[in-house]
């Protein structure tokens, strides 16, 4: 056992702040000699097709796969660890259990072997980690492993029905005796997609194959345990610049998992956002809540960020994260999130000066945590993309928000780290230095890290991953040796949280205070007491921005009182107070109180003082502006006003890259107006303007406005002007900007045209995206997609005998395909094609007759129709005749005739009035179409259309006869073959009322 007891002095606090800590290495145990490690070349897309076939194990992304990811967890007195077995030809998934009480080690070997990068076992992939958890409620073991955004179709279909890998044990397996801790305690897959009798991998976590779409395209499994023992799993859905975090929940009572729920939407552009984006960070369950912290990678390749930008943070007040999501200020956010700006904390890219496209590199050294009392800590790093540039910059950032504070404190006084952890109210940096573990500690809500543990002997480690539980670090490490099989160790390090419980309790009256510049008084009564009976507070020291103000050794611990008015930065408020010669300037200041008790234990509290400026308020119309080289006009109306009543603005001066342009002493403060068109670098735009002899050339320029008020106070504002020269990116085009197909289409192959207009350059790649999701990167011409070896790329079903039907064809709607061409200079162009998938049309059907008019007592009526299917592969099932929504008869083969032959009377019962006739055709796809006509049945004898036959009709009948109008032969009531006056008696007999002749 190794113990290092230290008393260290923080460089930021000089000699005033010390921290006692006794951190001990409790146990170290070797888990195996055979942890899989990739010892070969780091491949890329140019050589991944030719990996080493010998002993060396080439890899993609990184060399680590064992002791990597979510690979170590605890359950009661056991520590569980996952790993892959080395060497190169083994690769089995392994699970080890260490009994911390008796030192017993149990290991299970699973049949599954690491499948390698995109299914090539000769190329290792570091992203295919094994996530691990044990339910504290029922003792089931859960593992999700060996996947990187796979689905049924990508990578040539290599992962069909095997794109998600989940293994789980029976209840109670976690604490079985050593002899019973065996593979048979895990549940086999007996579903229809099982790969055999030794298949312990399940395609879904719900047990329902109908849910398999919910488990596709996932990466980076990580489990959490909530305060009530519920297991949660989170993973990343999708790709690097178009992704989402998803999570699900385990119900220990029913031993079942839910489907995945999204924290944020992917394909954000389709949902109204300006661009698609992915997440680089973590979802964590800390301090009793599910939380998310990440950096964003957008698909904008023309901004100053090479990959990621920003720091984003959110948390959920729902016990399991299913709703009630908020930003760090407690404001509700859209859930699932679409616009990441709703939860943005700050921009690390603002901490270096580069502005050119792809010049800022924010990758790695990002992590975050939250202490038990609610202090939020986020670490990040920003540097120049080009390490060789003369003005190379690199900044490590620690942003933290003490519990109760309203805003983050952003500190660049931070040496940097890759991960940050928490236990109790402290934050920790745990890592390797010279291959040996060390621990640094800071009180939550502070930036005061000191080293409390470091190993000076023992094995030299290559890397590791860790889990902290109940004040102990379970550090799972791989020893640095050689080959494709290297030893794995577990170290258990006690963080000595018990001593922290004895530390003093210290606090400011408020976590944050806002005052105006020139404030006269700020008195702070700092509360400090010991939680341990018999101890007393020896002193309280106040620091402002890490500078010691004073140490007070007696109650009350009051700073800024009448005898010391200046120590809190105030001017003074009594007549006897001389004005403070060094008052606090406008801006944010960190006040820190350090309490030390009679045993030498100490604690720290912080307060943020925001000092509002009295200086003028000045601003450009916008912070940055892009124009094309040779721009004709740039007029800038600079806003300037005093923040103090009674003061006025004396002048506003404009500078370009430090050179004075002009000082304006009267409103409006307008530069680049018609009388001075050249002063902002423009060419001029009026006929009276001669061309600018010295226009601003392509490049970036800093415009600075300096506003001065009548008291001589100044304020500066800046604007970045980017003058864009003519870029010459590749030219990429589709054969057609819009393609229309019918659902179920078998084939769609398209060759994309890509070329560079610049001599000496060539096209390096053409990348195809479907609705924002990566389809494939093609690195050699011709740029053909959807060909016979990749028939599904445009969503087609497949057309050759060897093509299995596409299980995920594109549905009805409009789909956007984006082609991105990249040339040898790194310039990119993109163009979109709209693929419109139409619903298969129903059959065509037509009633041959037009609208029909009949009289009651009609004797004959037949209706005929013709129909055909929309496609040769579709058959016609039936035609059905409806009259007034009443089915008359359905006919299953032509001829389609109603009212003839054996059915001659089926249409003879229509009553007086108008009837809707519909013929509905149905095809073998259950698609339907219809044709319709109207049949109008008039009352026989009702010549004036008043719905009765009466004397008026007989008179009209006689009148029509006299006028020689042709009458319907059905009015030949006496059957002599003509309609004449002798038929009047027959009409009278049809009168609606009796005694028609007397009406």
Curated annotation (Swiss-Prot):
This entry's Enzyme Commission designation comes to 4.2.2.-
Q: Which residues bind Ca(2+) 1?
A: 189, 199, 201
Keyword terms, alphabetized: Calcium, Lyase, Metal-binding, Signal
The record places the active site at 127 (proton donor/acceptor)
* UniProt GO BP: polysaccharide catabolic process
SUPFAM superfamilies assigned: Type I dockerin domain
N-terminal signal peptide? 1-21
Q: What is any Pfam family matched here?
A: BNR_4
Signal keyword on record: yes
Record GO terms (molecular function): lyase activity; metal ion binding
Write down the position(s) of the site called Neutralizes the sugar carboxylate group at subsite +1.
Answer: 236
Residues annotated to bind Ca(2+) 2? 300, 303, 305
The entry assigns this protein to a family as follows:
Belongs to the polysaccharide lyase 24 family.
Q: What does this protein do?
A: Ulvan lyase involved in ulvan degradation. Ulvan is the main polysaccharide component of the Ulvales (green seaweed) cell wall. It is composed of disaccharide building blocks comprising 3-sulfated rhamnose (Rha3S) linked to D-glucuronic acid (GlcA), L-iduronic acid (IduA), or D-xylose (Xyl). Ulvan lyase catalyzes preferentially the endolytic cleavage of the glycosidic bond between Rha3S and the uronic acid GlcA, but not IduA, producing oligosaccharides that have unsaturated 4-deoxy-L-threo-hex-4-enopyranosiduronic acid (deltaUA) at the non-reducing end.
Q: What is this protein called?
A: Ulvan lyase, long isoform
